């Protein structure tokens, strides 16, 4: 899986249609789109590079803002692992070279259906990066998306995700 899509609860099928149409326009006629058993969340496996999807949707919001209605957030996922602190840390280490020595970062944890401690995860991941932390304007976001027993991990530029709310605020 390389994308997490969030939507309003009970609008999963409309969201599935919307993201299918977007992916079709980009050249993927057969993406795998799954309900993960949590309301308001879909996981997507597509052949399209996630950053290309984010750029496309952001441009669509400028050109035709009414076209994106159901995809509240589109979140690229670079790795998936089990929801265990050691495994999460091992996978973050595999991606760590994305962040250069002088770059700032922020660690963001989003948890659903788990009791794992955010503070423990942040403490372990922070040990990997000697870089400056910037909570407001980081160069990079180390994103840990926990969905029950599975965890998606990404290291993204600050503008590497799509948020419908942010896009609407920017256009006003």
Predicted regions and their residues:
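SAM-dependent transferase fold signal centered on methyltransferase-like domains
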Residues: 1-172
């Amino acid at each position: 899986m390389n994308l997490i899509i969030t939507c309003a609860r009970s609008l999963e099928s409309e969201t599935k249609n919307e993201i299918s149409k977007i992916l079709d326009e980009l050249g993927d006629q057969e993406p795998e789109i799954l309900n993960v058993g949590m309301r308001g969340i879909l996981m997507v496996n597509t052949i399209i590079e996630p950053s290309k999807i984010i750029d496309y949707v952001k441009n669509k919001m400028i050109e035709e803002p009414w076209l994106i209605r159901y995809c509240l957030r589109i979140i690229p996922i670079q790795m998936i692992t089990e929801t265990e602190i050691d495994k999460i840390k091992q996978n973050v280490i595999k991606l760590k070279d994305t962040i250069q020595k002088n770059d700032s970062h922020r660690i963001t944890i989003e948890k659903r259906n788990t009791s794992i401690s955010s503070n423990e995860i942040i403490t372990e991941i922070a040990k990997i990066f000697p870089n400056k932390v910037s909570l407001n304007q980081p160069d990079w976001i180390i994103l840990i998306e926990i969905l029950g027993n599975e965890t998606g991990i990404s290291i993204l530029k600050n503008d590497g995700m799509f948020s419908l709310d942010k896009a609407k605020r920017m256009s006003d």
